[in-house]
Regions:
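SAM-dependent transferase fold signal centered on methyltransferase-like domains
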Residues: 1-414
Length: 414
C-alpha cells in the first residue's frame, strides 16, 4: 500500500473537519493531491473522532477505507478487552485477525510481548505505520493467514480472534461456522498455543448456542461477555480455556457498569407484583436483555417483576435508599409518579399537565405509536410512560421520571 505523500498529508490536515462530499469537487484545484486517498483519510478521521477518539487525537494515523472502520471495535469495547487482559495477568499475546488494529492497540499496552497477524498486506502496512505513532514499539507485525501461521507461532498466554463475518459476496454472516477462520474447528490447535483464547462474535448470536458450538473436544468456554456501549449491544465475547467449567460465568457490560453471574447457579423464581407511586422502576440494560439473565438480575438486587414477559422490574420505595440507590445498577432507573388503568377518569388524573412523553410498550397489545396517538401525546420530554400487562393480565400505564445515570463499575468488571 502506498502511504500518503507530503502534499496529500498537508491537505488532510488542512481540511480535516470539512464535508468530504464538497471536497470531492475540488480535485482539479489540487493536482498534486491524491484526492481519493485524502478523502478516505478525512472521512476516516471524522469517524474515528466518534468511534475511537484516542486515535483521532494522534497526528499522522492512517485510516483504512470505510468498511474496515465499520467493522472495527469502538474505543470503549477495546478498552474493556484491555482490562480483561490485565485481569488475566497476560504477559504475551497474539492477535490472529489484526484488521485495523484497534483492539490490538489497547490489549498490547498491557503485555510485554505482542504479535499482530493479518492476512491482507495493505492492513499490515497500515499497522506498521500506525503502531509506532500509538507508542507501540514492542509489537511485531506478521502478514499471512491465521490457520497457516498458527503452527509456527510461539506458545503465548493469550490469543485473540475477530473472525470475518462476511461471505464471498460481501453479505453478513453470524454463525461461528460461517466466519473466517472457523474458530470451532481451530479451537484445539489454538489451545495448544495459548492458555486463553478470546473470540469476538456478532451480538446477533445467541450466547447459549455459541457456547454449545465450542463444547466438543478439548476445552470450552469459561466466560461469556455481552458488551454494550450507550445501551446498544455491540459484541459477544467468548473466553476459552482448556480447563473450562461445565457452565461459564456471564458478564453483562454497558459502558462502565458490569453485572456478572454464575450460570451454574439456580436462582429463586421471580416474585411478581404491581408497583406503586414512589417505587423505583428498572429496565434492564441492553446486555442484561441480550443475556436473558433475569432471575439472576432480580435476585441480586431484590427486585420484583411485573410479569413474566414484561422484563420490567421494581423496588418498593421503602427498600430503595434514595436516588443514589441506582448508582451502578445495570438498568435504566425511573421513579414512578403515577400508576393507572385505562379508565378515562384515572388516565386524565395520571396525565394531568402532560403534553409530551417518551412512550414504550412491553407485553402490550398496542404499539408505542398507537398508544401515543390514543393518549394524544407528543413525543419526547422528561416524562416516560411504560404500558404493560401485569401477571394478572391487567393493562396498566406506568408514568415515571428518569433518575440520573451514575455510570460506575458495579462489580467484578475486568
Amino acid at each position: 500500500m502506498a502511504l500518503l505523500d507530503s502534499a496529500t498529508l498537508e491537505f488532510v490536515r488542512s481540511h480535516a473537519d470539512e464535508d468530504v462530499r464538497r471536497l470531492a469537487f475540488l480535485a482539479d484545484r489540487f493536482p498534486g493531491v491524491d484526492m481519493p486517498a485524502a478523502l478516505d483519510q478525512i472521512r476516516g478521521r471524522q469517524v474515528a473522532k466518534v468511534k475511537i477518539p484516542a486515535w483521532a487525537a494522534v497526528d499522522g494515523i492512517v485510516y483504512p477505507p470505510h468498511l474496515s472502520l465499520e467493522q472495527c471495535s469502538g474505543e470503549a469495547a477495546a478498552r474493556y478487552k484491555a482490562r480483561l487482559v490485565r485481569r488475566l495477568g497476560v504477559q504475551s499475546m497474539v492477535d490472529l485477525t489484526g484488521g485495523m488494529g484497534v483492539d490490538f492497540s489497547w490489549m498490547a499496552r498491557e503485555v510485554g510481548q505482542a504479535t499482530y497477524v493479518e492476512r491482507q498486506e495493505w492492513l499490515c502496512a497500515l499497522a506498521k505505520e500506525n503502531f509506532p505513532r500509538l507508542g507501540l514499539s514492542h509489537v511485531e507485525v506478521r502478514q499471512g493467514e491465521a490457520e497457516a501461521l498458527l503452527p509456527a507461532l510461539p506458545v503465548v498466554d493469550f490469543i485473540y480472534l475477530d473472525p470475518a463475518r462476511r461471505d464471498s459476496k460481501g453479505g453478513k454472516t453470524y454463525a461461528i461456522s460461517d466466519c473466517v477462520p472457523d474458530v470451532s474447528q481451530l479451537k484445539e490447535e489454538l489451545l495448544r498455543h495459548a492458555r486463553w483464547i478470546l473470540v469476538k462474535l456478532s451480538p446477533m448470536l445467541d450466547w447459549h448456542a455459541a457456547v454449545e458450538a465450542m463444547r466438543c473436544g478439548l476445552g470450552g468456554v469459561c466466560e461469556v461477555h455481552v458488551v454494550s456501549s450507550g445501551n446498544e449491544c455491540k459484541e459477544l465475547l467468548l473466553l476459552l480455556s482448556a480447563d473450562a467449567p461445565v457452565a461459564p460465568r456471564l458478564y453483562c457490560v454497558n459502558d462502565d457498569v458490569c453485572f456478572s453471574c454464575d450460570t451454574r447457579c439456580a436462582f429463586p423464581p421471580l416474585v411478581y407484583g404491581v408497583p406503586r407511586v414512589g417505587d423505583m422502576l428498572l429496565v434492564p440494560n441492553a446486555s442484561v436483555m441480550k443475556a436473558g439473565c433475569f432471575t439472576a438480575f432480580a435476585s441480586r438486587f431484590r427486585l420484583r417483576a411485573i410479569a413474566p414477559n414484561s422484563h420490567l422490574f421494581f423496588i418498593p420505595a421503602e427498600e430503595a435508599s434514595g436516588d443514589g440507590f441506582a448508582t451502578g445498577m445495570p438498568a435504566r432507573c425511573f421513579r414512578l409518579v403515577a400508576v393507572t388503568s385505562f379508565n378515562k377518569k384515572a388516565l386524565r388524573q395520571a396525565l394531568a399537565g402532560v403534553s409530551r412523553a417518551n412512550v414504550a410498550v412491553r407485553n402490550f397489545p398496542l404499539t408505542a405509536a398507537e398508544l401515543r396517538k390514543r393518549l394524544r401525546l407528543g413525543d419526547g420530554g422528561d416524562v416516560f410512560i411504560f404500558a404493560t400487562t401485569t401477571s394478572e393480565r391487567q393493562h396498566v400505564l406506568l408514568v415515571c421520571r428518569k433518575l440520573p445515570d451514575a455510570g460506575k463499575i458495579h462489580e467484578n468488571q475486568p
